[in-house]
Swiss-Prot record:
Shows neither neuropeptide activity nor antibiotic activity. GO terms for cellular component: extracellular region. This is Rubellidin-3.1. Expressed by the skin dorsal glands. It is found in: Secreted. Keywords: Amidation, Amphibian defense peptide, Secreted. It comes from the Eukaryota. Transmembrane segments: none annotated. Coiled coil: none annotated. The modification Threonine amide is found at T5. Its main location: secreted. It comes from Litoria rubella.
Length: 5
């Protein structure tokens, strides 16, 4: 899971 990319 990626956040703020």
């Amino acid at each position: 899971i990626e956040f703020f990319t």
